[in-house]
From Swiss-Prot:
This is Malate dehydrogenase. It catalyses: (S)-malate + NAD(+) = oxaloacetate + NADH + H(+). Belongs to the LDH/MDH superfamily. MDH type 2 family. The keyword Transport does not apply. It comes from Azoarcus sp. (strain BH72). Pfam families: Ldh_1_C, Ldh_1_N. GO terms for molecular function: L-malate dehydrogenase (NAD+) activity. The gene is mdh. Substrate binds at residues 93, 99, 132, 166. One of its GO terms (biological process) is tricarboxylic acid cycle. It is an enzyme of class 1 (oxidoreductase). NAD(+) binds at residues 12-18, 106, 113, 130-132.
Length: 330
């Protein structure tokens, strides 16, 4: 018997990332090749015409798994009964805009969306925030949604998978190993240049990649800055931000969360439970394994002095961001 369709809400549906994302969701890449979907597309009133154009293209693909679509500028409609919500739309940073202004502008958006999810989404809705600053935007949505007592805090996540995939690619290039052979990468912290991609545990066909590379200076001076500033490098080269790679990471994040990571470590920005000394509730990148729609933090990893230093720097940035929006959540 065929499965009942799953409602997937996508915000910023007319944007660059949305355009790279929607066709892959409709083709079954995210939830499986046997899972029909209904797309519930949210964007601003002035973007509705563009969303209609994207819907026309989706129709023209004749995807067997696309069971329906709606477009709306009302979050309450977009999130109604959604089992998966991809919060892609966010206010981009404009010229001369301070980071704190960006936080304030986005806090308004994610307060509204958190409330709509809290009231109208499926009680087990899995939420991924892609729009930056994604950890703090996810924190805002989570905090607001908790007021309604329906969707649990653990279901609100931020996207660290793009950093994870970027780091894998750099490690494959440096070690000369195939990217698919690399296991046990960790990305700690905030999705920002402070993130800490930690390859001390990475194995390739049983070999330690840290030993293969054996270059502490490369780690500190080349690898971490390259991964941390990759987004800026892409804007510099392309004139536009990374959209296809961000969409790809979102697909990876949800697919592994819903369908399981088969024992492999993946990175998700999740509300901390206090593990590794990270204060509870902060949305922080952790290594997790996923099974039956649940994630579990990989425990017992040794944290050396350099790692603790880097983990603290990225934590402090998150605490500062949280401080910057706390009045808006009062």
């Amino acid at each position: 018997m065929s499965k009942a369709p799953v409602r997937v809400a996508v915000t910023g549906a007319a944007g660059q990332i949305g355009y790279s994302l929607l066709f892959r969701i409709a083709s079954g890449e995210m939830l499986g090749k046997d899972q029909p979907v209904i797309l519930q597309l949210l964007d601003l009133p002035q973007a509705q015409k563009a969303v209609k154009g994207v819907m026309m293209e989706l129709e023209d693909c004749a995807f067997p798994l696309l069971a329906g679509m709606i477009a709306t500028d009302d979050p309450n409609v977009a999130f109604k009964d959604a089992k998966v919500a991809l919060l892609v739309g966010a206010r981009p940073r404009g010229p001369g805009m301070e980071r704190k202004d960006l936080l304030t502008e986005n806090a308004k958006i994610f307060t509204v969306q958190g409330a709509a999810i809290g009231q109208y989404a499926d009680p087990d809705c899995k939420v991924l925030v892609v729009g930056n600053p994604c950890n703090t935007n996810a924190y805002i949505a989570k905090e607001v949604a908790q007021k309604y007592g329906r969707v649990p805090a653990k279901n609100f996540t931020g996207m660290l998978r793009l950093d994870h995939n970027r780091a894998l690619s750099q490690l494959a290039g440096k070690s000369g190993r195939e990217v698919s052979s690399l296991k046990n990468l960790v990305v700690w912290g905030n999705h920002s240049p402070t993130m800490y991609a930690d390859y001390r545990f990475v194995k390739s066909n049983g070999d330690s990649v840290k030993d293969l590379i054996n270059d502490a200076a490369w780690n500190k001076d080349v690898f971490l800055p390259t991964v941390g500033k990759r987004g800026a490098a892409i804007i510099e080269a392309r004139g536009l931000s990374s959209a296809a790679s961000a969409a790809n990471a979102a697909i990876d994040h949800i697919r592994d969360w819903v369908l399981g990571s088969n024992g492999e470590w993946v990175t998700m920005g999740i509300p901390s439970d206090g593990s590794y000394g990270i204060p509870e509730g902060v949305i922080y990148g952790f290594p997790v394994t996923t099974e039956n729609g649940e994630y579990k933090i990989v425990q017992g990893l040794e944290i050396d002095e350099f790692s603790r230093e880097r983990m603290t720097v990225t934590l402090n940035e998150l605490l500062e961001e949280r401080e910057g929006v706390k009045d808006l959540l009062a």
